Amino acid sequence: DPDKAEYNYVKDVDYISGAAILLSVDLWKQIGGFDERFAPAYCEDSDLAFEVRKAGYRVVYQPLSKVIHFEGVSNGTDVNGTGLKRYQVENSQKLKEKWADEFKKQCVNDGNPNPFRARERSQGKKVILVVDHYVPTFDKDAGSKTTYQYLKMFLKKGYVVKFLGDNFLHEEPYSTTLQQMGIEILYGDHWATGLWDWLKLNKDEIDVAYLNRPHIATKYVDFIKENTNIKVIYYGHDLHFLRLGREYELTGDI
């Protein structure tokens, strides 16, 4: 499902499919184009991505780039036949041999790998989960603008940033703005029902939970404290204790 949250934010990846690659002519010439050892087809796109990184550049997935790819139409799907598809197996071995040292640095596949880090090449980076009541509408209210500025700061500091809006909605143009910055937003029914299991599964991968506002923090802080070792940071935004105290004086309830 291309509309799933995990497929719709800009991120570093191992390689980009040959169905849709964009790089500058200068970089193409610097690398020397596709390595001819992979002719006539298969793995040349994977190899190109490794060459791009070797040259000091990033390989980035752009979710707003969309193409329709008819799998197998050009060369079929039989890797054991006599057609061009057979080169997929042969060239995969060539790729492993050429980049053996690089493959050793990848996430270990023990037969049941957790793709949390491998899918965005975040090995060695700190991960922060930012939770607020909804995606920051940064041109409408001060609280949202504050959250938005903190998100940008976390990115600048080198964090991998995940954002959770407690209403689990995808709100435009704000959601796409965050996703284009490289922030994964946890939205939709899947996350509304599966968030707690996700936190347990990835408790050793998330370094910090940054909780905004008292009514949001109270919903999440106990679960995080009781089920994970994630460091919790609370940001109140306002002097809520003063407001709540005055409300209690007037109404006898809060």
List where the protein language model places each region.
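Short, flexible hinge/linker loops that cap or flank conserved catalytic cores
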Residues: 7, 14-15, 121-123, 226
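Acidic/His-rich active-site region of diverse nucleotide-sugar glycosyltransferases
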Residues: 1-32, 37-39, 46, 54-55, ...
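Extended catalytic core of nucleotide-activated donor transferases of GT-like folds
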Residues: 5, 134-153, 162-254
